[in-house]
Structures are given as structure tokens and as C-alpha cells.
């Protein structure tokens, strides 16, 4: 029987990558070969936890996140401006990231994707015959208390609960639209 390989793909801040290290260690303890594909800036973090590292891209995500451009984008109150801004930050790295995802998924039977790797990762999984699994450590269920993780929170004012629930439904529609293209 061929060796079961699971590729975890996670990009973003360390807080977005760290839960996948924990997941990888659990899968590894269950006897599964695990690869964690992420930005090269997390290579030592991944390997010091005993996981196989694969580079998605040579992107210093911490530097991008701390840039004045990123701070200005994150300060916006307009969800569409936020999405456009985030895409403008990642667009220059997209082809390199997609190539890295394809390499990391080679021979894998499952690709577990975080929200920031779902767009290219889903297609890479399908191309290579790996089952794509979406894994979210942020709340993705519509709720009154929190908005979608992909939009800025609204200040505490009347109507905030409606806004919070609506952001989740809008993101579900956008994700559905993306996968039907």
C-alpha cells in the first residue's frame, strides 16, 4: 500500500500558520507523512517541530503585513476596498505560490488548505488528484458576535449584529462564485 501523504498549505501570519503545525504533528503521530507548505520565512518554525517543510513562495509575509501599504489597507472600513487591497498585495506572488503549491502537493492524497491558500490550492489539488479539504481556524459560520475573518470589524453601534451576519453570507457567496468559475 502506498504511503499516505497529506500536504498542509497555510500562508499568512504566524498565527495563521501555527495551528497547521499542531494539526501536522497530530497527523504525524497517527502515522501519516505530513508536509507543511508555507512561506519560506516559516521554514525553521516548521522543521523545528519535526515536520517536512515545502516552500510555497519566497515571500516574507511578516514584512508584507507590517508594510505601510498593508496597514493602510487593513485600516479601511470598506470590505470591498479591503479585498481589493489584499489581492493587490498578493497578486505579484501568485504564480510563484501556485508553482510552490503544485510541487508541495506532488504525490499527496490530501491537500488541507487555509483560507489564504484555498484559491490556488483548490485548483492545484484538482490538477494533481489530491482531495482538497478546507480547514478554517477563524469563524466561518454566520454569527451576530463576529464578522467574517475577511472583512474589518464594524465599531460597536446599533446594527452591528446584522453587519456581522451579512459579512459571512457575502463571503460564502464570493467563495461559491469563485469555485463555479
Language model: regions and residue ranges:
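Nucleotide-sugar-dependent glycosyltransferase catalytic domains
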Residues: 29, 40-181
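N-terminal subdomain of nucleotide-sugar transferases
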Residues: 1-54
Amino acid at each position: 500500500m502506498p504511503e499516505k501523504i497529506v500536504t498542509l498549505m497555510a500562508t499568512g501570519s504566524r498565527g495563521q500558520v501555527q495551528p497547521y503545525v499542531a494539526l501536522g504533528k497530530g497527523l504525524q503521530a497517527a502515522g501519516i507523512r505530513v508536509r507543511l507548505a508555507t512561506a519560506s520565512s516559516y521554514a525553521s518554525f516548521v522543521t523545528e517541530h519535526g515536520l517536512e517543510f515545502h516552500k510555497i513562495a519566497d515571500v516574507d509575509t511578516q514584512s508584507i503585513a507590517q508594510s505601510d501599504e498593508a496597514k493602510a489597507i487593513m485600516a479601511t472600513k470598506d470590505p470591498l476596498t479591503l479585498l481589493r487591497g489584499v489581492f493587490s498585495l498578493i497578486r505579484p506572488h501568485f504564480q510563484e505560490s501556485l508553482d510552490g503549491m503544485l510541487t508541495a502537493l506532488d504525490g499527496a492524497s490530501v491537500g488541507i488548505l487555509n483560507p489564504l491558500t484555498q484559491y490556488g490550492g483548490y485548483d492545484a489539488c484538482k490538477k494533481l488528484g489530491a482531495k482538497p479539504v478546507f480547514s478554517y481556524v477563524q469563524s466561518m459560520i454566520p454569527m451576530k458576535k463576529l464578522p467574517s475573518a475577511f472583512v474589518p470589524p464594524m465599531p460597536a453601534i446599533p446594527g452591528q449584529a446584522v453587519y456581522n451576519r451579512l459579512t459571512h453570507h457575502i463571503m460564502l457567496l464570493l467563495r461559491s462564485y469563485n469555485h463555479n468559475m
